[in-house]
Amino acid sequence: MQRLLFTPLTAFLGSPCLRLLVPRVAPRTQCGCSCGIRRPLRPGQYSTISDVALQPGRSTVSLPSKAAERVVGRWLLVCSGTVAGAVILGGVTRLTESGLSMVDWHLIKEMKPPTSKEEWEAEFQKYQQFPEFKILNHDMTLAEFKFIWYMEYSHRMWGRLVGLAYILPAAYFWKKGWLTRGLKGRVLALCGLVCFQGLLGWYMVKSGLEEKPDSHDIPRVSQYRLAAHLGSALVLYCASLWTSLSLLLPQHKLTETRQLLRLRRFAHGTAGLVFLTALSGAFVAGLDAGLVYNSFPKMGESWIPEDLFTFSPLLRNVFENPTMVQFDHRVLGIASVTAVTVLYFLSRRIPLPRRTKIAATTLLALAYTQVGLGISTLLMYVPTPLAATHQSGSLALLSVALWLMNELRRVPK
């Protein structure tokens, strides 16, 4: 009977993955025997085990806390990569004017694409009932419709993949006890934001399917909803990447000086400016403002075009006037690259770790590359490959800005 009870336990504790999680010598009582009452453990005896490891009543053994942090950090890094992919694919979908090809939304039903000719004809007939076909694409063939349909379908399926990448591992890590109390709150917020993002995407598409007051208005999604959709995706991306970097990268113990504090604050402001510039790109895309003035540095024949304030009230121009929207994006882009340049030279005046210097240098190089891509996209009348690369560059620039912020973060005492 003893053999049946204790042999599996011995084999379990003898596995290589658990040898570091238990003491080499079993704790004994004062009398030297191995009875049920144990002496208090010496400090550090279980220093590699998380606070939930080997608790009574648990059927599993938790990973060491540092190992669990690395696993969770890598998971969030992968998640941020999937969000970046969704943003890039969504940008290409917008550039190819494919976003309004799927005129309804079903969480499960639409996962199966049409297969027969009859199903494709039925899908095409649904599309023909909406303004985009009637005004812009009335001579579209079925083959052309299939292309834009598959573009939107790919974006939607990728969005579902993003949801699974967040929710399923989150549930697993929660059950295993690998999430600290602080991480649990963050992970819940991230999963909630993923679900909100999906609903916001359909809310955006609906705006492009509605009949406009003027029957000759170009069908397009609301630039406000497009900016909200992109903005929430960027927030999700930044939050995931920041948490991942905080878990994976060891913190630098930097000497807190006035110069370091100023550099840290300036890095935060620069990252915010980069975020705002990327967000303004949604208004440029939503209004096709990149096709208004295709010259640089001037806009047409002047530095400040005359049609900046054609709408009334004046505030409407900031969000609805294509000329003003392009002008704002130019100004924000120039302000961003200027801020990155100043940040780089400020970082050179302070003794910083090598990894932090690499982040600052990479940020500078990416900023000027992004400006070059933006100017080229403008001068070449927004070709899809170049415009998609420019959008991807904004994500790369934002990522490195977050990396530099993470390098400069204050170490808690």
Curated annotation (Swiss-Prot):
Its cofactor is heme b. It holds the Pfam family COX15-CtaA. It catalyses: Fe(II)-heme o + 2 A + H2O = Fe(II)-heme a + 2 AH2. Residues 1-70, 175-186, 251-271, 348-362, 406-413 are mitochondrial matrix. It is found in: Mitochondrion inner membrane. Heme o binds at residues 155, 229. Heme b binds at residues 329, 390. The keyword Iron applies. Catalyzes the second reaction in the biosynthesis of heme A, a prosthetic group of mitochondrial cytochrome c oxidase (CcO). Heme A is synthesized from heme B by two sequential enzymatic reactions catalyzed by heme O synthase (HOS) and heme A synthase (HAS). HAS catalyzes the conversion of heme O to heme A by two successive hydroxylations of the methyl group at C8, in a reaction that involves matrix ferredoxin and ferredoxin reductase. This is Heme A synthase COX15. It comes from Bos taurus. The gene is COX15.
